Amino acid sequence: MTYEGAIGIDLGTTYSCVGVWQNERVEIIANDQGNRTTPSYVAFVNNEVLVGDAAKSHAARGSNGVIFDAKRLIGRKFSDSVVQSDMKHWPFKVEEGEKGGAVMRVEHLGEGMLLQPEQISARVLAYLKSCAESYLGKQVAKAVVTVPAYFNDSQRQATKDAGTIAGLEVLRIINEPTAAAIAYGLDKADEGKERNVLVFDFGGGTFDVSIISVSGGVFEVKATNGDTHLGGEDVDAALLEHALADIRNRYGIEQGSLSQKMLSKLRSRCEEVKRVLSHSTVGEIALDGLLPDGEEYVLKLTRARLEELCTKIFARCLSVVQRALKDASMKVEDIEDVVLVGGSSRIPAVQAQLRELFRGKQLCSSVHPDEAVAYGAAWQAHVLSGGYGESSRTAGIVLLDVVPLSIGVEVDDGKFDVIIRRNTTIPYLATKEYSTVDDNQSEVEIQVFEGERPLTRHNHRLGSFVLDGITPAKHGEPTITVTFSVDADGILTVTAAEELGSVTKTLVVENSERLTSEEVQKMIEVAQKFALTDATALARMEATERLTQWFDRLEAVMETVPQPYSEKLQKRIAFLPHGKEWVGTQLHTYTDAASIEAKVAKIERLAKRALKSARREGKDGWAPGNEDNGSGDDNDGDDNSDEEDELQRGRGVTEGSGRSPIRKRDRIEAINANTE
């Protein structure tokens, strides 16, 4: 018999947890060892495949064939600097796969095997699935799985793939801090009072901070920030480096002379002492067999020393908190509760720094740090599998998450046109209209970027596709509709269509080119740092574009004017060589956007007056009501004449991929629709 509902799984870097909604509450399910959390370890030993506690026990003994940290590899390229750095600390081998991804080599049943991170994660998911089946007495087919808030599209899709491999239909990918907020707020959903909650999710391998507004049954994410490569394992690594330095200094033993088995044992001892120092001020690392004379190696550690070794790690945590507050436009006093999630949030130094930042506020301990994420996932699983309305505790609850970075397309001259802005609530759908830059253009390249800078060359390219079959027409006339849709899993789909040609193309952005959280934050910081210079660069680019259009149009009309020109026309066009010279030799010296705009506006006024005079004297003739009013100004009521519209349509072609890009339609507003 198959269970009609769904389970919730917190697939962690170091530990995982599974829960299910039963009897009006979430039940956290213990594994076959009686533990409510399961190590995210898989061991290929003695012709067996072990998962969880049994696998980790082999790691502690230094056995070969034990794989862990799959979450730090999933969705990443082998060439990723993060992967290259982590490889130095892993006892297992990591190689480059066929498509450039990171794969792990193991020996099993006498054969060498290359395993994808998804396959390792699938083993953990399958084990948790079996634990749930033992608890429920039924087969389980559906689940909600959590990921760090800053996981990119590739990592999210890879996690869904792992669920599929494990025999699960993944109903939803949900962000870990959002799931934890549900665990915190489920009992407060009927209070009605709006509360701003900061979720501090410091796990084994990832770190997220989300600021969530809880009001009645609505959980709305206001901002999220994080680091997908920061967690308790970084503390373990710092302790390991300290121990290796001590061994080298006291005994002259270099790391290279230690076996992988001994390094694995030492790493396990470092993790153990880290846990001890969370509730004791003194601990020690003790290990037999390391020293040549058989003497036991002992290194005493104090909590103060651990805090000293990890100063930079803890500082990184606080900086993420401060960035999240800034993104949410909130101050520390706007936060009612700080919810601690993840085993690493137990570290006393971390809690002390948080209390100091939030001016002595009592940190929330009403949710279990190790179980909160699975708790929220189980609630979401209950709702998505049809349980909505069956429980008075879940009826009326709405979950609203956000995108971490602005996404958009490149338009002519390499400008970044944002379609969905950072921290926009998802699921979300936005549509904008664009057009062509050349006459009879039959195709356009849609290039998709994410970032916070106004020029695409400073942002990160996600992918591109060509929309062909466009109806031949004058440039600016075809209507190209571009739609961005971010689903509830945070995965982006881009669709472009041209109505007359009845052509449509779609791109699902689920590749490994999406940014890591570190790259995202760096881009935000750089955008803030260079905001002024970016504005100036954009102003220069637009000034050149606008004035060149006026100059070209004026010269084209002048060719239709019989010579000699009238005295008035000669005076009107006298600015032209000076205007061209300013664009070519002086514009680049201007250092602020306001002064550029003032100069451009002045030249545009002169160009417009000259163009009107030239039209009157040219082959186009003149029309009643369009005469010069004789005062030398332009107050003749035709400031919105056809020539300006023609100039707006006459955007130039840019350099780039060799394909013509799209251009923005200035008069057409974005059409945004929040999809429920």
From Swiss-Prot:
Residues 630-646 have a biased composition (Acidic residues). One of its GO terms (cellular component) is nucleus. Residues 613-676 are annotated as: Disordered. One of its GO terms (molecular function) is ATP-dependent protein folding chaperone. SUPFAM superfamilies: Actin-like ATPase domain, Heat shock protein 70kD (HSP70), peptide-binding domain. Pfam families: HSP70. InterPro entries: ATPase_NBD (IPR043129), Heat_shock_70_CS (IPR018181), HSP70_peptide-bd_sf (IPR029047), Hsp_70_fam (IPR013126). The keyword DNA-binding does not apply. Keywords: ATP-binding, Nucleotide-binding, Stress response. Belongs to the heat shock protein 70 family. This is Heat shock cognate HSP70 protein.
